[in-house]
Amino acid sequence: MTPTELAKSRLETTYNRFAPFMQCIALYVIVFVLSALGFILSATEKKAWGEALRRSASWVLYATLIVHTGALLVRMSLMDRPFVFVTNLYSSAVFIGWGCVILGMVLERIFPLGVGNAVAGILGMATTIVAHNLTTDDTLEMMEAVLDTNFWLATHVTTVTLGYTATFVAGFLSAVYVLLLCATVVKDGFTDPKPPSLGGLLSFGAAAGGVVGIPMVLLWFFCTAAAAKFEWVHSSIPMVVLVVTGGAAAFYAGGLLFLKAGDVAVDADGKPLATGQLPAAAKPLAGMALDADKVKVFGQMIYGVLCFATLLSFVGTVLGGIWADQSWGRFWGWDPKENGAVLIVLWNALILHARWCGMVKTRGIAVLALFGNVICAWSWFGTNQLGIGLHAYGFDTRLADGCTNFWLSQLVIMGLGMIPAVYWASATRRRAAAAPVVLVPVALIEEALAPTPGPSVVKKKKRKK
């Protein structure tokens, strides 16, 4: 064995013992917890604590990114493939997570709200857990002959996976937006002086369930994925977490709905609340409610990320066609993987054109971007389960079940995002929408009835101007 081979063997042994991506999972959990707590405290009166936690999450995220980047570089060195990060499904997961973290950090730098850190933590944790569930006996396995070309692996595959990255980031930003929208429904439901209608109660109940249900689903997903692979996580943990958190979420949401429907809310002294006053149970959500500034920021973030997703997906798909022409003698063959790639391009382009044409605004973009998660997951993993085509890697029950659960969760969040605006718009907008239509403005009537000023008065007004 040459000295170079010996050094590489020692490097691989150290890499396997340290398990850098396993360390990243714990660090991403810390980032997400700090970001979530910071965002919640920033929405209350403890803004200084919220800002401190947000900055702490950023520093932990920087450290985690260093570990994640170092692990990718070590893998590249061990495989002797310069500038090639993706060689199999496992490496695609860890690379997509790396891209999501960088994009989240950029968003946090531009919009220091804690949202970028939270999305980076969620996606970094999720992708590394997915990668761990995709591990085989050897994650540095040999490449298939048809894929053994560094140029196309460094261009087409990298660009396409970065398109996946941007699409997922836009989708998870949209999920956070829907979460805040649900908090807005709860807040405005209590501040609306009108008696609740049946539709209002249904929307209020769905929002109250969603504002606690979305975090619960994320927690259950991560616990299930961890229990499936990590020996130190007992198999009953996901069910225990689901029962405990689900019960707490149902109790909280049911309590809010009872207060809204029964009009029995009281203050700390036990006295009935005045009309439009928030009960104590709903105050934690009041600061999370959307306002004009938050809606504008989320619209800018989701739109900007979708632009990058469209560009990267389009360029990557075209490069894939050129590679297919060189390898298989045809540019396009309607292979399931190729269809999945073009679906991402078409869907992201559809969202952008809908916005440019004024057909949708921030909420519409968010709901459509959530379905982009469904399409992206289908292109990434779903097409591999069909067992046909040149990109199929065989059916995997874990991937099939995981994709199905993920798709259902995105459809539920989309449903919450489509709560009618009349139930979550601000009180001012509700009053404006309910105001009677006046064909002749009052100002014109007053102007017509007012006495006509004389010439001298008109001249004086002109001189003042």
Please identify what each model-predicted range represents.
Residues V186-L198, D291-M301:
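Hydrophobic, small-residue-rich membrane helices and short re-entrant helix-turn-helix hairpins
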Residues V437-K465:
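Long, low-complexity, intrinsically disordered cytosolic termini of multi-pass membrane proteins
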Residues M1, F18-K46, A52-R81, F85-E141, ...:
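Hydrophobic cores of alpha-helical transmembrane segments in multi-pass integral membrane proteins
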Residues E144-D148:
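Segments that form or flank anion-binding pockets
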Residues P196-S203, G454-S456:
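Short secondary-structure subsegments characteristic of cysteine-rich extracellular domains
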